């Protein structure tokens, strides 16, 4: 009985160590609290303007919203704003973004429009000109095959470009390794751990073990995130524990069919898509 009790206690301690978020840093949180942030910019279901395009970002900034966006490397290490790992959904091309050089990638039309994928630097400059106070939530894209050196270079380059932006910003990622690297490279920067539900991870083909680890924020010990960005599904016990331990709660992605008032009441910030909420709800 004593051995069993010790095992249970050890598991509790290890779980707490794994999921414990970072210390509250209210000054860093303040620009994001109660804000509605446009997911990949302010765009419609018809992709006019296209997601993650300069017009979508300008529309979000001029309407007073925060902006969520995605960054990754091209083959020649240019930081671009693009969500998918592959090009086929948003462009006529095929293949991975990280395998295509910038000159070829930049020529691809977005969703059949006259717009093209922007460089991160151009996006930052454009938003600063439209509304320099726009809060930015920057998701660093990652894949399991990316090694530590590659991710360190991507994080370092992203952070360097963000330093040119006059407004508030933070970094998030689904990959706890990225959050950990940001913690080491820029400890004074607000950082967040993105998480999806176990069911969603399994639907995309993830093995049960990593699906459980990622959905239950068991990689938080690497980055000690300031916030957890959680999906529309009911929070699991680990996400609820993070909230109780002081993590800022961000919701992604609120859609028109959701109870958006409830989501705003339950979260410190909301990442929305395909509707026009108030800029600030708290």
Regions found by a protein language model. Give the residues of each.
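Phosphate-group recognition and catalysis centered on beta-loop-alpha active-site segments
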Residues: 2-282
């Amino acid at each position: 009985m004593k051995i069993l009790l010790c095992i249970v206690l050890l598991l509790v301690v290890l779980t707490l160590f794994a999921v414990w978020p970072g210390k509250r840093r209210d000054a860093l949180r303040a620009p994001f609290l109660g804000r509605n942030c446009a997911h990949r910019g302010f765009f419609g279901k018809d992709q006019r303007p296209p997601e993650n395009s300069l017009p979508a970002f300008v529309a979000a900034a001029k309407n007073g919203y925060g902006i969520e966006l995605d960054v990754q490397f091209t083959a020649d290490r240019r930081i671009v704003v693009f969500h998918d790992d592959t090009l086929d959904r948003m462009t006529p091309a095929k293949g991975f973004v990280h395998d295509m050089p910038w000159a070829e990638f930049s020529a691809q039309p977005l969703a059949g429009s006259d717009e093209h994928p922007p460089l991160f630097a151009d996006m930052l400059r454009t938003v600063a000109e439209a509304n320099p106070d726009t809060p930015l939530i920057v998701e660093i894209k990652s894949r399991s095959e990316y090694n530590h050196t590659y991710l360190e270079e991507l994080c370092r380059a992203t952070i360097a470009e963000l330093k040119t932006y006059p407004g508030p910003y933070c970094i998030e990622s689904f990959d706890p390794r990225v959050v950990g690297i940001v913690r080491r490279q820029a400890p004074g920067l607000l950082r967040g751990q993105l998480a999806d539900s176990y069911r969603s991870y399994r639907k995309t083909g993830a093995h049960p073990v990593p699906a459980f680890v990622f959905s239950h924020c068991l990689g938080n010990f690497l980055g000690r995130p300031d916030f957890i960005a959680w999906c529309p599904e009911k929070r699991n016990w680990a996400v609820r524990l993070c909230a109780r331990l002081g993590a800022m709660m961000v919701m992604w992605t609120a859609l028109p069919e959701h109870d958006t008032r409830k989501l705003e009441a339950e979260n410190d910030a909301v990442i929305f898509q395909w509707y026009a909420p108030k800029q600030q709800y708290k």
